Curated annotation (Swiss-Prot):
Heme binds at C470. It comes from Cordyceps militaris (strain CM01). The chain crosses the membrane at residues 2-20. One of its GO terms (molecular function) is iron ion binding. This is Cytochrome P450 monooxygenase milC.
């Protein structure tokens, strides 16, 4: 009996301590909210617990969820930051520059990656800069970023001569399409293969020749011909990865053997590059070469293996470089070409700008990085494409401590908002970039000239912002500008169906044109 009484006393004490702690936490939160003048957010009403009806709507929707579900809910609520009535810890959804600045920059230490990010994408991307926590000294994110920073600071990474063979292969394939009478064939798979070859050349020690592998199915292909290895892996992984991201804590519902096999394709390729780099690192140095020559021969992967022996981290970094480098550039180039095809005058203007900088009539040797930066219209084409079609249109963070957002509360949305620890926040550059109050009444139109005299701010986040801004941003912009310039050198015209309004898009791991890239690139001799 005494033992039972002791158990009851211990249990009651533990419960009392728990209740007391929760009461102290609640009191501290109320005080923080009161001291900061916080008021509640607008609340969207879900019909089922945990927002199950909303999650089901997202999973089963066959249209464009960004336009049909996400943008429309902002419009229905009449604000650009809100929460919902989900049980437990309701999320915050926003498309507000001030909120994004706070989360990504000024209150960076109060927020971390969404706790569902790693389990959702870990089977594919592993750890590293895209999915790891940035909290704590010596965090995995900081380690991975420190390994990558000197490589992206190296001017050799931006050497156009490295990527020119891949670009020449792409131009040759476009010539084959024209000769075969298929000038308006969907170019999306060819653009992705181009970027596979570029990224593997620059970062992995050599192209895997994805374009050559895909040449057999480029013109008059046998429908049964197997896709190139990375293309097949991408096509298998991305739809499932997109669902795993969009459904939050229910990511585990979406998996399959093809998905796991696709993930193994990426890790297998990365392991092969690492093994070759390690073998080269362990070779005895050639004393007949001076140190400068030896250093110049090191590729990106060889530099990585000289900085760490953590094979798992090395593999994850390479896989993430493949994903981020290939998909981001593919998304941008695809949308840019479709918009240029819909606006023939813009293509003519681009060619005229290149001619004015003595880059039109010559070959690749006439195109320099410095001159590309001086081509204002070319740079504005890229900016405007990334505004209307950001590759990652929705992202997320999670509050790791009680914090306050600068605005969004109260009837007019001008008051601060208290955010308890554990709150998930989803933010949409896609919606923000299309706001008429930020970009004018023509916000839904592709207009590169809107960037004349306008500098990007926190209302423009195609590459994120703050300490976690995309480390490969400069490379993506540089290589994309070079490819567009080479295409403009080669082809007199770029045409697509003359439709109006934004291009219909499809969301997987990144945003791509739903109908592909049915663009015709031709010249007067074709």
């Amino acid at each position: 009996m005494a033992i039972h009484a002791a158990y009851i006393f211990i249990a009651a004490t533990l419960i009392a301590l728990y209740v007391a702690r929760r009461m102290r936490e609640q009191h501290a939160r109320q005080k923080l909210a009161r001291d900061q003048g916080c008021e509640p957010l607008t609340t969207a009403i879900n019909k089922l617990p945990y927002g199950l009806d909303r999650k089901w709507q997202i999973v089963t929707h066959r249209g464009n969820i960004l336009d049909d579900l996400i943008t429309t809910r902002f419009a229905e609520l009449g604000c650009y930051i809100y929460t919902d009535n989900q049980w437990g810890s309701p999320p915050i959804i926003c498309a507000e520059p001030a909120t994004m600045k706070a989360v990504l920059s000024t209150k960076f230490r109060d927020w971390d990656m969404d706790s569902n990010r790693y389990p959702a994408l870990g089977p594919w991307l592993g750890r590293g800069v895209l999915v790891s926590s940035h909290q704590g000294k010596g965090s995995l994110w900081a380690t991975a970023r420190a390994l990558l920073r000197p490589m992206f600071a190296n001017t050799a990474t931006y050497n156009h001569a490295l990527i020119e063979p891949s670009v020449q292969e792409f131009l040759s394939i476009l010539g084959h399409l024209n000769q075969a009478g298929a000038p308006d064939k969907d170019l999306l798979p060819f653009i992705r293969r181009l970027n596979v070859d570029i990224i593997t050349t620059v970062f992995c020690g050599g192209s895997i020749n994805e374009q050559q592998s895909g040449l057999a199915i480029a013109v008059g292909a046998d429908a049964k011909h197997r896709k190139p290895v990375l293309e097949e892996a991408f096509d298998t992984i991305e739809p499932i990865a997109g669902l795993r991201l969009q459904t939050g804590s229910m990511y585990w519902l979406f998996t399959s053997k093809p998905f796991r096999d696709g993930c193994e394709t990426f890790t297998g390729l990365a392991d092969g590059w690492i093994n070759r780099a390690l073998s080269k690192r362990d070779e005895k140095p050639d004393l007949s070469q001076d140190e400068g020559a030896a250093a110049r021969e090191k590729n990106f992967t060889e530099e990585l293996v000289s900085s760490t022996d953590d094979r798992e981290l090395l593999r994850d970094i390479l896989v993430q470089l493949l994903f981020a480098g290939i998909d981001t550039s593919t998304s941008m180039l695809s949308f840019a070409l479709v918009e240029l095809g819909r606006h023939p005058s813009a293509w003519a203007r681009l060619r005229a700008e290149l001619a004015a900088h003595n880059m039109l009539s010559g070959g690749p040797e006439t195109i320099t990085a410095a001159q590309l930066k001086e081509c204002a219209f070319l740079q504005n084409i890229i900016k405007e494409t990334l505004r209307l079609y950001p590759p990652v249109p929705i992202n997320s963070r999670e509050a790791i401590r009680d914090t306050v957002l600068p605005s969004g509360g109260g009837a007019d949305g001008s008051k601060p908002v208290f955010v308890p620890k554990g709150t998930s926040l989803k933010y949409s550059p896609y919606v923000m970039h299309r706001r008429e109050d930020l970009y004018g009444p023509d916000a839904l139109l592709w207009n590169p000239d809107r960037w004349i005299g306008r500098a990007p701010g926190w209302d423009y986040l195609p590459f994120n912002g703050g300490p976690r801004v995309c480390i490969g941003q400069k490379f993506a912009l540089s290589s994309s500008a070079y490819v567009l310039a080479r295409l403009a050198q080669q082809f007199d015209t770029c045409t697509a169906l003359p439709t109006t309004g934004p291009i219909d898009s499809k969301l997987g791991a990144v945003l791509v044109p739903k109908a592909g890239v049915p663009v015709s690139l031709t010249n007067s001799t074709t």
